[in-house]
């Protein structure tokens, strides 16, 4: 859970194959911690998915939900399926190029959801998955200043049935780029 909280306010930077720099501030994340997490499906359905999720910490991985790719950071020792899902970004650089990848009529819809941000950054899961989070083409920069507790909201997770009431969704309070998904409740930090 600590990594999920620490990613908030950081910058996700994408350098496209044609040299464009796209970046966004991480404004929403969710943690998943198998095997104790009832929402974690890695291993419940088939071994290939479990192996995909159980990579070394500090590497990118993609999970597909309803056919859409979701960007995650592996965060436990190799062999254990645990990750942080990046749910939303506030665009900082390259919004025009992001719109080329993901045309939208409302700018807020560009990166305010986990699949939306993958499409807006033009990410190819086959090219990025299992690469270190400090790869030149996609990397994370730590926040210049860690967020204060009063700047962070902790809620129940969204878009899942089991384990949704765990306090593992973190977002920057009042940020307009947070996904529109509504949790069932705001919770105390873990």
From Swiss-Prot:
GO MF, any single term: alkylbase DNA N-glycosylase activity
EC annotation from Swiss-Prot or TrEMBL: 3.2.2.-
Top-rank EC class of the record's enzyme: hydrolase
Superkingdom in the source lineage: Bacteria
GO biological process: base-excision repair
InterPro entries with a match to the protein in the record: Formyl_transferase-like_C_sf, MPG, MPG_sf
Keyword rRNA-binding: no
Keyword DNA repair tagged: yes
Protein family (similarity comment): Belongs to the DNA glycosylase MPG family.
Protein name in UniProt: Putative 3-methyladenine DNA glycosylase
Organism in which the protein naturally occurs: Deinococcus radiodurans (strain ATCC 13939 / DSM 20539 / JCM 16871 / CCUG 27074 / LMG 4051 / NBRC 15346 / NCIMB 9279 / VKM B-1422 / R1)
